[in-house]
Amino acid sequence: MAQHDFAPAWLNFPTPPSSTKSSLNFEKHSENFAWTENRYDVNRRRHNSSDGFDSAIGRPNGGNFGRKEKNGWRTHGRNGTENINHRGGYHGGSSRSRSSIFHAGKSQGLHENNIPDNETGRKEDKRERKQFEAEDFPSLNPEYEREPNHNKSLAAGVWEYPPNPKSRAPRMLVIKKGNTKDLQLSGFPVVGNLPSQPVKNGTGPSVYKGLVPKPAAPPTKPTQWKSQTKENKVGTSFPHESTFGVGNFNAFKSTAKNFSPSTNSVKECNRSNSSSPVDKLNQQPRLTKLTRMRTDKKSEFLKALKRDRVEEEHEDESRAGSEKDDDSFNLHNSNSTHQERDINRNFDENEIPQENGNASVISQQIIRSSTFPQTDVLSSSLEAEHRLLKEMGWQEDSENDETCAPLTEDEMREFQVISEQLQKNGLRKNGILKNGLICDFKFGPWKNSTFKPTTENDDTETSSSDTSDDDDV
């Protein structure tokens, strides 16, 4: 026989006709069986987790309990003693088959009370189904807000009792009122308006109008709004508290405990992690406003970045002029002779075409680095490296002019192989090659192309002076 799989109540979805059909079905067939030996007790305990699982399994008066109509099973028990416990109300997917089976059992047990018991069963069935729909789908029947929610307790979790939309309305209205008028007076006059607010907006579909704040609220006190968002950036990440400063919200909390409609809502403000999806949907317009306010600094930063990039493009056009300026700037810093500079420039020109189409990337690097004293585009790590190279490489350059001898062909080939390997691995993008290829070309214009071989020699000097750059990378 089909035993019950103890499915939780929230898995079953309500289909109204099936439960009434099943209860009528029981009423019709209850007259076929003799119920004289043992009658059901009217106040029989209901089983919560096993919906429709009645206590007649081991008893002699089970009867044809829950005949499945669609499959056409007619199983008349022996003298009404065999319990064939099919899931009577489940064949239509009824969510509240528990109540229909239960009341049909009562009506079979007490035959003279057949009709009133079934009617009460249907009423209870409707009420429970309505409550279930309203708690889980408040947008389907907004008139549910008129009924009081009896089984609401703060101790239970959100799974047992989903958040009730009625208790949500005063909370959101507190937020709306607090934004407009008296928030600077630490919130005390505002709470006095609470009991009158649900009367205006608490019933019918107008609750959703109350949940959405008016667009006129932020412009009335713009300075207050901005200061509160700044204050919230430091401390709070809760969406409910985001329109208030923390201090003002605590004042609300302390005074709101005097009013019965607002106690649940104020306490639930701190339980924003367990709020239902409906709650989050209702808060979206307010949150989008706040995020717009909060991303002001970010948008300003992005605008500045775009401006810098546009400037860089302009400097790209005037690249020749800027390089000349850099050359004249570097003439003061370097004491090397014109001959060495010419030789190194020749090597530079030989080396750039050998980079296999990297010339465009390198030119961008040169431009960005050449504008370094003017614009703060480089990151902090590159700045630090720039400073370090200034301290190490550039000062040594004037002293160690004899090390600036032209590179041999072996060194050139070695450098090219290493740079190609690194290019293939894509390490340039990750910034690992900071003291390698990028730096060689980055500081080329400053030194009028004399710095490149010196960095090569410096790198080889630091790595035991005979080995290649493989040790550094």
From Swiss-Prot:
Keyword annotations from UniProtKB, A to Z: Activator, Cytoplasm, DNA-binding, Methylation, Nucleus, Phosphoprotein, Transcription, Transcription regulation
InterPro entries linked: Vasculin_fam (IPR028128)
Transmembrane regions: none
One cellular component term from this protein's GO annotations in UniProt: nucleus
Reported tissue expression: Widely expressed. Some isoforms may be specifically expressed in veins and arteries (at protein level). Isoform 4 is widely expressed. Isoform 1, isoform 2 and isoform 3 may be specifically expressed in vascular smooth muscle cells.
GO aspect biological process, one term: DNA-templated transcription
Region (Disordered): 1-25, 46-149, 191-342, 444-473
Residues where Phosphoserine is found: S49, S274, S276, S322, S381
Residue ranges, compositional bias (Basic and acidic residues): 119-133, 293-329
GO molecular function: DNA binding; DNA-binding transcription factor activity; RNA binding
Primary location recorded for the protein, binned into one broad class: nucleus
Organism domain of life: Eukaryota
Polar residues: compositionally biased ranges: 194-204, 251-286
Sequence ranges of Acidic residues compositional bias: 456-473
Subcellular location: Nucleus; Cytoplasm
Chain positions with Omega-N-methylarginine modification: R87
Similarity-based family: Belongs to the vasculin family.
Function: Functions as a GC-rich promoter-specific transactivating transcription factor.
Subunit note: Interacts with GTF2B, GTF2F2, RNA polymerase II and TBP.
Name by which UniProt lists this protein: Vasculin
Species this protein is from: Homo sapiens (Human)
Gene giving rise to this polypeptide: GPBP1
